[in-house]
Amino acid sequence: MNRRSKWLWIEPITGSRKRSNFFWACILFLGSLGFFLVGISSYFGENLIPLLSSQQILFVPQGIVMCFYGIAGLFISSYLWCTILFNVGSGYNKFDKKKGIVCLFRWGFPGINRRIFSRFLMKDIQMIKTEIQEGISPRRVLYMEIKGRQDIPLTRTGDNVNLREIEQKAAESARFLRVSIEGF
């Protein structure tokens, strides 16, 4: 939901709370938990999970390896769940024509740098850039070029945005900021 008026444009940014992240976090958690429980079952010699038979699996070396992969998967799954819980990457882009200021805000992991906030003047914005790479894994990203700074992405690099949407967003941003568009 974009909030836009003649002088102010606030664009919310979706963070890590996406359906795909929930899906992969669940799949990874269940799979790694299964690996870990089968490895532990092979150690005790009993089936802890009725559906997964561990009678033919020796603890050394298969059970140890399954426990290791299960623990590694649980750590990766907990990382994914933490990014979802803290909504890492979410925030907003705020363009204020009256004050001539652009503010970019994102949430990070807890700690000193939990709030990531960038502020700069609109007159320092040189252009809006679009990076479009087609192929097996297409990449379509919208950047804002600012004097004396590196290009700042306005869209997430992992989002699968179609070509029409990225072009419309680039045109809308350039029109509001009154800058040119460059594609590469």
UniProtKB/Swiss-Prot annotation:
Extract the InterPro entries matched here.
Answer: PSI_Ycf4_assembly
Q: What is one term from the GO cellular component aspect held by the record?
A: photosystem I
What family is reported? Belongs to the Ycf4 family.
- Keyword line: Chloroplast, Membrane, Photosynthesis, Plastid, Thylakoid, Transmembrane, Transmembrane helix
Q: Which NCBIfam families match?
A: PRK02542.1
The places in or outside the cell where this protein is found are: Plastid, Chloroplast thylakoid membrane
Q: How does it sit in the membrane?
A: Multi-pass membrane protein
TM spans, by residue?
Answer: 21-43, 58-78
Job description of the protein: Seems to be required for the assembly of the photosystem I complex.
GO biological process per UniProt = photosynthesis
Which PANTHER family does the entry link to? PHOTOSYSTEM I ASSEMBLY PROTEIN YCF4, PTHR33288
| Keyword Nucleotide-binding in annotation | no
Name of the protein in question = Photosystem I assembly protein Ycf4
Q: Which organism is it from?
A: Pinus koraiensis (Korean pine)
